[in-house]
Amino acid sequence: MLEDYYPSTTSYYHGGIDDDLYTAKWGMVMTFLDLNDSSLTPFEGTHFALIGFKSDKGVYINNGRVGAVESPAAIRTQLAKFPWHLGNQVMVYDVGNIDGPNRSLEQLQNSLSKAIKRMCDLNLKPIVLGGGHETAYGHYLGLRQSLSPSDDLAVINMDAHFDLRPYDQTGPNSGTGFRQMFDDAVADKRLFKYFVLGIQEHNNNLFLFDFVAKSKGIQFLTGQDIYQMGHQKVCRAIDRFLEGQERVYLTIDMDCFSVGAAPGVSAIQSLGVDPNLAVLVLQHIAASGKLVGFDVVEVSPPHDIDNHTANLAATFIFYLVQIMAQHN
């Protein structure tokens, strides 16, 4: 039995039900699935599993604006309203949440990793609704556990921050997840392939830039780089990064976007990547056929305005799933 795991029991869709797929919405089509059901066998074809990670403990430890614990419900509500374009050959299963208000950050990350591995064993593509960016380490661990030690797993992070902070004295938080991944790779004598899109210089100290400069497998583009390059050159940079890689895990921190597009985040961003450009880049990553799982994190509903940020996060999920369904 999975720990800290709660299957979904409540629908987030409150509109009229229509059997016609031409007019269906996500909320009509998504089906509940209990990962603890021992009768389940691996699914055939391309299907997705949506799980919430109800934790912003890492944000609290990192002195951010708490509230991301409420994000999974907010994103589900927005996603349920979107039109369904995938016919009846692709399914998105809502498998519930990882939740544990009295559990430690490390315990919740471990619980998420086990749930992710269970999804992969069932041949379901994981979609995780954070939660703070501590979500990423649990998601990454689960993906790695589903692979053999020699299998590669590159990481692309759309984020204003490197999230490579040391954690030896403070313990892990929302800003340390990718340093934990890096350290795991070093311990296993693997190269940590990590590409950050949307870095803002005013959000990262010199220690982090120095760490990146000395690390062979880490690359980044600043938000200003992306603005100047345009999506086609950014996509070519991603292609070069993924050359020779078989798998990539994608994580989207909503603080990558300006406060005008994403006001409800744990750490607001005055600058930021254009969401329209981001959609094109995300679709390109999905079209590589290498994307094995993704998450959206750091949506903070108590700080949102008219669900702008939750809706944008749901929009990214919509377009990623559309492309992944065609290229997997």
Curated annotation (Swiss-Prot):
One Pfam short name: Arginase
Pathway the protein contributes to: Amino-acid degradation; L-histidine degradation into L-glutamate; L-glutamate from N-formimidoyl-L-glutamate (hydrolase route): step 1/1
Residue positions binding Mn(2+) 2: 159, 161, 253, 255
Manner of cofactor binding, per the entry note: Binds 2 manganese ions per subunit.
GO BP: any one term: L-histidine catabolic process to glutamate and formamide
GO MF annotation: an example: manganese ion binding
Catalytic activity entry: N-formimidoyl-L-glutamate + H2O = formamide + L-glutamate
EC number: 3.5.3.8
Binding site for Mn(2+) 1: 133, 159, 163, 253
Annotated Gene3D superfamilies: Ureohydrolase domain
UniProt keyword list: Histidine metabolism, Hydrolase, Manganese, Metal-binding
Domain of life: Bacteria
Enzyme class: hydrolase
Cofactor: Mn(2+)
InterPro entries on file: HutG (IPR005923), Ureohydrolase (IPR006035), Ureohydrolase_dom_sf (IPR023696)
Function in brief: Catalyzes the conversion of N-formimidoyl-L-glutamate to L-glutamate and formamide.
UniProt family annotation: Belongs to the arginase family.
The name this protein goes by in its record: Formimidoylglutamase
Gene that produces this protein: hutG
